[in-house]
């Protein structure tokens, strides 16, 4: 199938959702050579990935994931694409603890850094979380603590082989979009930041096709986050309905911040910023976390709108609840000596 798909893409033709799924299955099963996989990814990138193509690929990634069981009707993910090149601290990871502190169950999907200096796995490890915890421990964390980290590299074994091809290509491919769409626990409520504004409506359409219950796809001022530095493009998906709009920090009751306030460093430096935010330190990093945690609370049904979400997120931090969730996750994943 992959040879036919490559030929079709080179003619500028789109693949159906089923065709994209067949090719991804072939790649996952080891039926495609590295040259074929690379040609497919490059041809698809050159043509431009469609909603159906991304949805078909995501179908297979979800099916092949090592499934994490979550015994909750509503739980969220705050995994974004990364790759925005702005080197901010780990905003969505911090927002996950704030959401958990506000009573929302979180199955946080993530990975180590690819283009940044600190991915979610890197900063969590620097904070003392054992990101390599086995699946049973992760499930227990989600159930007992209310938050767990789903390490992508451990839970998507079928796609380890493609990592080398992606590295050798050295350009963004469909895989840069697939991570947030393939939560191994099957989260249907999520905040998904994308690295370019053009992907906001596309991934909104993909999430609708994949059956998202309530999700936000966002890109703000060059960030794969809701921005407190200017305008954010939003695609809100709710039970198959898609709504597009823009928001500004003032709409959330937050001041406009300078982008320089949000710049992080390596995992250790970012862990310090995360800790400062969770300990209640005021400033740009806190406001960025409040904005993104607010969206997480809205999609989980724990806040009526984004302004209400900001207020609830602030209480999660100021009460110490968010910081306590981090402490509990560290304790729950620590291997006894």
Curated annotation (Swiss-Prot):
Pathway: Amino-acid biosynthesis; L-tryptophan biosynthesis; L-tryptophan from chorismate: step 2/5. Anthranilate 2 binds at residue 166. GO terms for biological process: L-tryptophan biosynthetic process. Keywords: Amino-acid biosynthesis, Aromatic amino acid biosynthesis, Glycosyltransferase, Magnesium, Metal-binding, Transferase, Tryptophan biosynthesis. Binds 2 magnesium ions per monomer. GO terms for cellular component: cytosol. Mg(2+) 2 binds at residues 224-225. InterPro entries: Anthranilate_Pribosyl_Tfrase, Glycosyl_Trfase_fam3, Glycosyl_Trfase_fam3_N_dom, Glycosyl_Trfase_fam3_N_dom_sf, Nuc_phospho_transferase. Homodimer. This is Anthranilate phosphoribosyltransferase. The gene is trpD.
